[in-house]
From Swiss-Prot:
Catalytic activity: (8S)-3',8-cyclo-7,8-dihydroguanosine 5'-triphosphate = cyclic pyranopterin phosphate + diphosphate
Uppermost EC category: lyase
Pfam families in UniProt: MoaC
SUPFAM superfamilies with a match to the protein in the record: Molybdenum cofactor biosynthesis protein C, MoaC
Binding site for substrate: 75-77, 116-117
EC numbers for this chain: 4.6.1.17
HAMAP family hit by this protein: MoaC_B
Record-linked PANTHER family: MOLYBDOPTERIN COFACTOR SYNTHESIS PROTEIN A
GO annotation, biological process: Mo-molybdopterin cofactor biosynthetic process
Protein name (record): Cyclic pyranopterin monophosphate synthase
Length: 164
């Protein structure tokens, strides 16, 4: 059984000491999504939302969120991130509902992984899209948020299998 590393001998929270870990290249890819109605889909696609360019703003929010993960997730280490990317792709198969898939990739060269940074980026990206379009429809659905893959570090690589 795996032990919880963020709990000390007294049962209280602690931040894990990574001093003795090896410096390696670490990358994590996370996914989230938001399902919107046709009006919002058209506003985003045609860049006609009155608050501005929704995707550009959400992309910047995702990048900022990754950079600030350690300030909102208590046991995360502050990391010198070396790369953050946010990609979007529309799924139009269930029109008149449209799902915007969000994929975030975060990398560093360091002593601990960037899974939480990638997940935080994906979440903040979806939340920003909701915030910028909620005046049109508050019924949007933010979908599952999950880690797609990670590489580097002591625990090795991870690749989510379909259906996992």
């Amino acid at each position: 059984m795996t032990e919880f590393t963020h709990i000390n001998q007294q049962g209280h929270a602690k931040m894990v000491d990574v001093s003795d870990k090896q410096i390696t290249k670490r990358t994590a890819v996370a996914h989230s999504s938001i399902t919107v109605n046709e009006t919002i889909f058209k506003q985003i696609s045609n860049n006609t939302n009155t608050k501005g360019n929704v995707l550009n703003t959400a992309q910047i929010a995702g990048i900022m969120a990754a950079k600030n993960t350690s300030t909102i997730i208590p046991m995360c280490h502050p990391l010198p991130l070396t790369g953050i990317d946010v990609h979007f792709s529309w799924d139009e198969t269930n029109a008149p509902l449209y799902t915007l898939n969000i994929q975030t990739t975060v990398s560093t060269t360091g002593k601990t992984g960037v899974e939480m940074e990638a997940l935080t980026a994906a979440s903040a990206t979806a939340l920003t899209i909701y915030d910028m379009t909620k005046a049109v429809d508050k019924g949007m659905i933010i979908g599952e948020t999950y880690l797609e893959s990670k590489s580097g570090g002591k625990s090795g690589d991870f690749q989510r299998q379909s259906g996992q």
